[in-house]
Design a protein with these regions (language model features):
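Glycine-aromatic micro-motifs
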Residues: 2-238
Length: 238
């Protein structure tokens, strides 16, 4: 059958938050779970999640030498919007990488860490990586903590091992609520991201919106119906 080609996208940061992805990329459904071996997860100098190859993987696999994420089927239109949200090419670059994939609902991966009950299928996926700021050890931005915690909640429900969350993600992301002011900023960022690190030129977003990729419509960042679901989650109403 013909049709527009679609990619598999591996999200490992705040795009673990299903509601955020549904507003940023409304035509790109969540398909399942992914594991990227031989890589490490960290917060870089921008204050956001990044991954890099593990320098010397140990013979016995550890949580710190693999990255877990959620997998989405990405349309070309949503990919263009995601590029803007990810600050391509200034903040992140795009790569096609082999990721182990479990289809949603298979129930082969759980919080007990029994990840090898059934091997996943190896698939090529789109991954966003910051190759310039490739070191960890930095604090996450406060609003990013909010979005990551929502993503962690969804990731655990979808089968990301709790041990990975505890040993890797929780090393950077505290399980705590932020102030209402910070939560409101997180709400805006979830609807349509605006870089606060100074890495992405301000004009890039303006040019992209002018070319027809309207973040306010796609993400609901203007305070309309598109962001309602996100606001409800942050306020605890939904």
């Amino acid at each position: 059958m013909g049709g527009t080609p679609q990619k598999l996208y591996f999200g490992y940061g705040s795009n673990l938050w299903l509601d955020q992805m549904s507003h940023r990329c409304p035509s790109s459904p969540h398909l399942g779970l992914g594991r990227l071996k031989g890589h490490k997860w960290f917060i870089n100098s921008r204050g956001y999640a990044n991954i890099a190859r593990s320098p010397s993987p140990s013979p016995s696999r550890s949580e710190a030498e693999e990255v877990w994420g959620l997998v989405y089927q990405l349309t070309p239109e949503d990919e263009a919007t995601l590029d803007i949200n990810e600050g391509v090419p200034y903040a992140y670059e795009k790569r096609e990488i082999t990721v182990e994939f479990w289809e949603k609902g298979t129930g082969v991966v759980g919080g007990d860490g029994d990840k090898d009950k059934k091997r996943g299928e190896e698939r090529e996926m789109l991954v966003y990586i910051d190759f310039e700021r490739d070191k960890g050890g930095f604090k996450p931005r406060e609003e990013y903590i909010v979005r990551m915690n929502r993503g962690i909640d969804d990731a655990l429900k979808e089968g990301v091992p709790k041990r990975y969350v505890d040993e890797v993600l929780r090393g950077y992301i505290p399980a705590e609520e932020q102030s209402m002011e910070v939560q409101k900023l997180a709400e805006k960022q979830a609807g349509g991201f605006r870089d606060e690190s100074g890495v992405v030129p301000t004009r890039v977003t303006a040019e992209a919106v002018g070319s027809g990729v309207d973040l306010l419509k796609v993400g609901g960042g203007g305070g309309g119906g598109g962001v309602k679901g996100i606001r409800g989650v942050l306020d605890g109403r939904e």
